[in-house]
Amino acid sequence: MGSIGANNAVADPTPLFSSRVQKWEPGAIRSLLPLEALPGMISLVAGKPSPETFPIAEIAISLKDTPAGTGRIVVDGDELNQALQYGLPRGNAQLIQWFESLQRSVHGLDENGGWSCCIGNGSQELIHRVIQVFTDPGDPVLLETPAYPGVAGFLRADGQELIPVYSDAQGLNPASLEQALSEWPGDSPRPKVLYTTPTGSNPTGQSCTESRKAEILRLAKRFNFIILEDDAYYYLNYGDDKQRARSYLALERDVNGESGRVVRFDSLSKIVSPGMRLGILTAQAAVVDKVVRITENINLQPSSTTQLLALSLLRHWGQAGFLKHCAEAAEVYRRRRDVFVSAAERHLQGRATWVVPTAGMFVWLELKLPPEMDSFELLKSQGMKNGVLAIPGVAFMPGNEQTCYIRVSFSLVPERDMDEACRRIAGLVDRCACHS
């Protein structure tokens, strides 16, 4: 992986590209679509339906009264026709520009740093595409563990070798990462990617400290791998802003004197709407281009309609309004966390341990179970019977190891039910202890 330039060099990711991604060829039709915008061009290219056949006259959105502002957004005319028509594989150009401006403001990216953004149908689709860019079936992948099962699931189905890198209360542990890489067999290719969820991690709820991120970035340069920064909960950070860790994307230049090893994923799912299915990829242009090539050959594009709805909302808010909305959403989850943690302190002291999260919507409970019992068996045999459900820790273990952990989500359960939920979990632990 070479460098371009001297100061603030750009690491070239292309030597790490997989064999399979080279097989994707440009779509013969989709690659011509940007040329339709050239002045004076008469296009006979695309088999697009005529807008006069679209039955929708306008889309109107009424906004809630929030600190980000209120109002009504109407999409009609040519803009509506654009929202109902085929679009570009990379995504709506204006929406991409909006997010590129946000990344410069929030993460301090250079105007001409060789990076760009593209849009996907949710960040998980983009993560899957980037995995295809860098790995072939059977390749090893470094996976923050406990791991988000959505990604672990498709990695396992793709035949990848999952290499656990363990996290704790301070996030991903660089000592675990260094050990895995230092002890790697010399006759086997090293992993080329590390997947991590650094803020309000799903499932642990923990956030990686800035000092640890710096150590991990140094390891990425030393062992020549790419960091996949899945940061869906970044804007749901309700901790002390002064102690908030910068993103890997923001830190990379300061730590390593270069950029290009971090591929970042953002999402509107947790802060606007999961039903919109909009994710944002930020990476070196060569990586984005490969992702776009896969998109144009598989599902053509992200949804034009939801992209334009999102763009209309974000333009209405502006960056300041967007950040105000995110802060208000984070405050909602902070209050809900406080209610849940208070209930846990009343009922689960001595029965479980946990670390209070500073972002996201999860608490990772370590139940005090007998050695022969794991949380999956407990929930399967007693959870439904006693009217309480949570996700057993085995769901987040790449090797399906037994564990005494459970993941609880406080995002949707009514606050009035949190106390009873913790009381029922305590009852499960007590009954398990009595029968051991």
UniProtKB/Swiss-Prot annotation:
The modification N6-(pyridoxal phosphate)lysine is found at K270. Induction: Expression is positively regulated by the secondary metabolism regulator laeA. Its cofactor is pyridoxal 5'-phosphate. Keywords: Aminotransferase, Pyridoxal phosphate, Transferase. Belongs to the class-I pyridoxal-phosphate-dependent aminotransferase family. Its EC number is 2.6.1.28. It comes from Emericella nidulans (strain FGSC A4 / ATCC 38163 / CBS 112.46 / NRRL 194 / M139). One of its GO terms (molecular function) is tryptophan-phenylpyruvate transaminase activity. Pathway: Secondary metabolite biosynthesis. GO terms for biological process: alpha-amino acid metabolic process; terrequinone A biosynthetic process. Substrate binds at R30, Y86, Y148, N202, R407. Aminotransferase; part of the gene cluster that mediates the biosynthesis of terrequinone A, an antitumor agent. The first step in the biosynthetic pathway for terrequinone A is formation of indole pyruvic acid (IPA) from L-tryptophan by the aminotransferase tdiD. The nonribosomal peptide synthase tdiA then immediately converts unstable IPA to didemethylasterriquinone D (DDAQ D), via condensation of 2 IPA molecules. The symmetric connectivity of the 2 IPA molecules is thought to arise by head-to-tail dual Claisen condensations facilitated by the TE domain. Disulfide bonds: none annotated. CDD domains: AAT_like. Pfam families: Aminotran_1_2. It catalyses: 3-phenylpyruvate + L-tryptophan = indole-3-pyruvate + L-phenylalanine. This is Aminotransferase tdiD. It comes from the Eukaryota.
